[in-house]
Swiss-Prot record:
InterPro entries named among the record's database cross-references: GPCR_Rhodpsn (IPR000276), GPCR_Rhodpsn_7TM (IPR017452), P2Y12_rcpt (IPR005394)
Function text: Receptor for ADP and ATP coupled to G-proteins that inhibit the adenylyl cyclase second messenger system. Required for normal platelet aggregation and blood coagulation.
Residues in compartment: Cytoplasmic: 51-61, 119-142, 208-233, 299-342
Keyword Transmembrane helix assigned: yes
GO molecular function, one term: G protein-coupled ADP receptor activity
Gene Ontology annotations of biological process type: adenylate cyclase-inhibiting G protein-coupled receptor signaling pathway; platelet aggregation
UniProt cross-references to PANTHER family, sorted A to Z: P2Y PURINOCEPTOR 12, P2Y PURINOCEPTOR-RELATED G-PROTEIN COUPLED RECEPTOR
Protein name stated in the entry: P2Y purinoceptor 12
Species in which this protein is naturally found: Macaca fascicularis (Crab-eating macaque)
Length: 342
């Protein structure tokens, strides 16, 4: 197995710029393997629990869409692991470029979009904690969810179709080598659109959590001295969303800008290009980590999910009865504490 590949000429240097692939062929496949098993177990469990919970709030609808997106992303990991470790033949690399890599980014931006919607929902819960969802709002949330999936699918499908060139050799170093001329143009357009999606949701998260922090501080000032410690502890939980967003998605999108410049323009020397490559791969792994961190959001912020999980862990046979109890509460008017209060 070749550990070092010749890539490109470094600006201002006639020697070839080489890159050590031991990290990407050994370390990252191991890290993705860990994510695959942890993510598959936790998200399969989350999927089972959410199938037992009725979609009685916008929050739960968005969480259900998130767990589906995460599970789809996780299912792409084995193909990436085999491809990066050079354990598969040329057709596997072609399949990764044409299908699984597209699905990976497709699900990434779906998750980003739903985290933005969940953030807006948490802000509304902070300012109007006793407002309940009505059927009209639930229908709107479902329609919005379908539109997000449809929009991202329509963006991603051409990337699959236009990755249609036959590889010149068995070892395809870049997926761009397999794209048609228009495929490269479309890929660039999609990259710009995805950047816009991220930055819009980035602003949503920043603005909403600034307002949430102000509201929680006002609430703390009003209730200071009353001794409502449990409420203060609950309030802190809402910040898990911004923590997941910043850990998983922000580093990649900040690293992506200089990395793209290093691929399209001669503005960095060889050492800088290699550093940017490793930074990009590291931050891409962090985006994958999101699939393992989202279950913490479900557990800490969704009481129905938390109760069902605890019941399942205590006694697996009681999970069905817990689900029936939840459904009975919903028929009787719902559990006012179904979501973690602000």
């Amino acid at each position: 197995m070749q550990a070092i590949d010749n890539l490109t000429s470094a600006p201002g240097n006639t020697s070839l710029c080489t890159r050590d692939y031991k990290i990407t062929q050994v370390l990252f496949p191991l890290l993705y393997t860990v994510l695959f098993f942890v993510g598959l177990i936790t998200n399969s469990l989350a999927m089972r629990i959410f199938f037992q919970i009725r979609s009685k709030s916008n929050f739960i609808i968005f969480l259900k869409n998130t767990v589906i997106s995460d599970l789809l992303m996780i299912l792409t990991f084995p193909f990436k692991i085999l491809s990066d470790a050079k354990l598969g033949a040329g057709p596997l690399r072609t399949f990764v470029c044409q299908v699984t890599s597209v699905i990976f980014y497709f699900t990434m931006y779906i998750s980003i979009s739903f985290l933005g919607l969940i953030t807006i929902d948490r802000y509304q819960k902070t300012t109007r904690p006793f407002k309940t969802s009505n059927p009209k709002n639930l229908l709107g949330a479902k329609i919005l969810s379908v539109l997000i999936w449809a929009f991202m699918f329509l963006l991603s499908l051409p990337n699959m179709i236009l990755t249609n060139r036959r590889p010149r050799d068995k070892n395809v170093k870049k997926c761009s080598f397999l794209k048609s001329e228009f495929g490269l143009v479309w890929h660039e357009i999609v990259n710009y659109i995805c950047q816009v999606i991220f930055w819009i949701n980035f602003l949503i998260v920043i603005v909403c959590y600034t307002l949430i922090t102000k509201e929680l501080y006002r609430s703390y000032v009003r209730t200071r001295g009353v001794g409502k410690v449990p409420r203060k502890k609950v309030n802190v939980k809402v910040f898990i969303i911004i923590a997941v967003f910043f850990i998983c998605f922000v580093p990649f999108h900040f690293a992506r800008i200089p990395y793209t410049l290093s691929q399209t323009r001669d503005v960095f020397d060889c050492a800088a290009e290699n550093t940017l490559f490793y930074v990009k791969e590291s931050t891409l792994w962090l985006t994958s980590l999101n699939a393992c961190l989202d279950p913490f959001i479900y557990f800490f912020l969704c009481k129905s999910f938390r109760n069902s999980l605890i019941s399942m862990l205590k006694c697996p046979n009681s999970a069905t009865s817990q689900s029936q109890d939840n459904r009975k509460k919903e028929q009787d008017g719902g559990d006012p504490n179904e979501e973690t209060p602000m």
